[in-house]
């Protein structure tokens, strides 16, 4: 269900704005997207796992809030990120 630490480190390295950057919206959104995809795969097999479904909805809501923040803060960074992640917006 959860992503491995090595996968998370690769995502952080790819989207970080500087060394040691784990808190920028881009990094947080990219990590949440990977976690959402992993949970989505889990739920496609385990359809009755309602606890994981609730966790998925919370992660989606958190990502939505971060995307809205980034869109209001810097539209070019927002557009670059959704293009890189392949999100629908």
From Swiss-Prot:
One of its GO terms (molecular function) is rRNA binding. Keywords: Ribonucleoprotein, Ribosomal protein, RNA-binding, rRNA-binding. One of its GO terms (cellular component) is cytosolic small ribosomal subunit. GO terms for biological process: translation. It holds the Pfam family Ribosomal_S15. PANTHER family: RIBOSOMAL PROTEIN S15, BACTERIAL AND ORGANELLAR, SMALL RIBOSOMAL SUBUNIT PROTEIN US15M. One of the primary rRNA binding proteins, it binds directly to 16S rRNA where it helps nucleate assembly of the platform of the 30S subunit by binding and bridging several RNA helices of the 16S rRNA. Part of the 30S ribosomal subunit. Forms a bridge to the 50S subunit in the 70S ribosome, contacting the 23S rRNA. Belongs to the universal ribosomal protein uS15 family. NCBIfam families: S15_bact (TIGR00952). This is Small ribosomal subunit protein uS15. It comes from Lacticaseibacillus paracasei (strain ATCC 334 / BCRC 17002 / CCUG 31169 / CIP 107868 / KCTC 3260 / NRRL B-441) (Lactobacillus paracasei).
């Amino acid at each position: 269900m959860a992503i491995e630490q090595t996968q998370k480190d690769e995502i952080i390295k790819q989207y970080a704005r500087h060394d040691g950057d784990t808190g920028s919206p881009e990094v947080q959104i990219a990590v949440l997207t990977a976690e959402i995809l992993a949970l989505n795969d889990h739920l496609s097999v385990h359809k009755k796992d309602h606890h994981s479904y609730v966790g998925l909805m919370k992660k989606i809501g958190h990502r939505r809030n971060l995307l809205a923040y980034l869109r209001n803060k810097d539209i070019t960074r927002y557009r670059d990120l959704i293009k890189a992640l392949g999100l629908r917006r």
